[in-house]
């Protein structure tokens, strides 16, 4: 999977297909807050997402409180957003 930074146009196009994901102010990253029925559902999501992240060798920044999981994605080695971030965001949307 390519680790080249996306152009602004590529990122904007990708975001139109990623429900709920937005650019992070002051940083080259994308973020989304997921809400679930309860803690078990939130933790289940994190477990499934972690397995996909490991397969991609690309790991999210995330924060969990009860039924909410806040996720931020960026490719640190590229100091920006790459196709890996978009692929993981798509997978997270699909399993949420």
UniProtKB/Swiss-Prot annotation:
Gene Ontology biological-process entries: tetrahydrobiopterin biosynthetic process
EC number from the UniProt entry: 4.2.1.96
Keywords, sorted A to Z: Lyase
Example GO molecular function: 4-alpha-hydroxytetrahydrobiopterin dehydratase activity
Catalyzed reaction equations: (4aS,6R)-4a-hydroxy-L-erythro-5,6,7,8-tetrahydrobiopterin = (6R)-L-erythro-6,7-dihydrobiopterin + H2O
Pfam families recorded: Pterin_4a
Classification via Gene3D superfamilies: Transcriptional coactivator/pterin dehydratase (3.30.1360.20)
Similarity comment: Belongs to the pterin-4-alpha-carbinolamine dehydratase family.
Protein name as catalogued: Putative pterin-4-alpha-carbinolamine dehydratase
Organism the protein comes from: Brucella anthropi (strain ATCC 49188 / DSM 6882 / CCUG 24695 / JCM 21032 / LMG 3331 / NBRC 15819 / NCTC 12168 / Alc 37)
Lineage: Bacteria, Pseudomonadati, Pseudomonadota, Alphaproteobacteria, Hyphomicrobiales
